[in-house]
Amino acid sequence: MTELARLKFYATQPHSCSYLPDEQATTLFLDPSQPMDVHVYADLSEMGFRRSGDHLYRPHCQNCNACVPARIPVAQFLPDRNQKRILKRNADLTVMPAKPRFTEEYFDLYQRYIEERHADGDMFPPSRDQFSTFLVRDLPFSRFYEFRADGRLVAVAVTDLLPNGLSAVYTFYEPAEERRSLGRFAILWQIGEALRQELEAVYLGYWIKNCKKMNYKTQYRPIELLINQRWVTLN
């Protein structure tokens, strides 16, 4: 473990919660002057931190603990029947890694995704600056995994490669390809990729029981939840 006690953190003022509209949220950030070291990142991921752009953060709310960090221990994962169907349905896709960068092809897909799937969220309306600030960072451990069907871009899984696992930062995909269940397929692919790289887990971010948009995360079993600073298996 890195010497985490030497790191500095800053908490925001309370602000509106993006997931639970009746709640106020506080966010804890790693000091942005601290270099984005992959080993620090890996250690903080074990403590429930996530990356957004150049920042590592986790919820630090005074009166709410609804945001529960979740990860999939990939060596124990077994796909259910529906997940096997999703894998079969997308067997024609090719997946290639790319360096994070801005292209009109990426942004056009991202724009369609946000407008169709998240028009009620705080990322709407999508913009080029938002895309670049959120996803296009010059970090040696970050990848854009491109999913293509006959050369046509249908999904991008923004993924961080850590010593202890893969962190699923964000995935955006073609909303017209609903039958493929591309968001779920991207996670299944990341599980397979973590196994191929002999890594321990895929970090999915936060699961919130009362947020319907988060329900899909517990469909991958077993899943581990960080509760009282311990990873607990939910079978």
Curated annotation (Swiss-Prot):
PANTHER family registered for this protein in UniProt: ARGININE-TRNA-PROTEIN TRANSFERASE 1, ARGINYL-TRNA--PROTEIN TRANSFERASE 1
InterPro entries: Acyl_CoA_acyltransferase, Asp_Glu_LeuTrfase, N-end_Aminoacyl_Trfase, N-end_Aminoacyl_Trfase_C, N-end_Aminoacyl_Trfase_N
Entry's EC annotation: 2.3.2.29
Annotated keywords: Acyltransferase, Cytoplasm, Transferase
GO-annotated molecular function: arginyl-tRNA--protein transferase activity; leucyl-tRNA--protein transferase activity
Catalytic activity field: N-terminal L-glutamyl-[protein] + L-leucyl-tRNA(Leu) = N-terminal L-leucyl-L-glutamyl-[protein] + tRNA(Leu) + H(+); N-terminal L-aspartyl-[protein] + L-leucyl-tRNA(Leu) = N-terminal L-leucyl-L-aspartyl-[protein] + tRNA(Leu) + H(+)
Signal sequence, renumbered to the chain: none
Gene coding for it: bpt
Keyword Transferase: yes
Protein name, as recorded: Aspartate/glutamate leucyltransferase
Known function: Functions in the N-end rule pathway of protein degradation where it conjugates Leu from its aminoacyl-tRNA to the N-termini of proteins containing an N-terminal aspartate or glutamate.
Source species of the chain: Pseudomonas fluorescens (strain SBW25)
Similarity comment text for this entry: Belongs to the R-transferase family. Bpt subfamily.
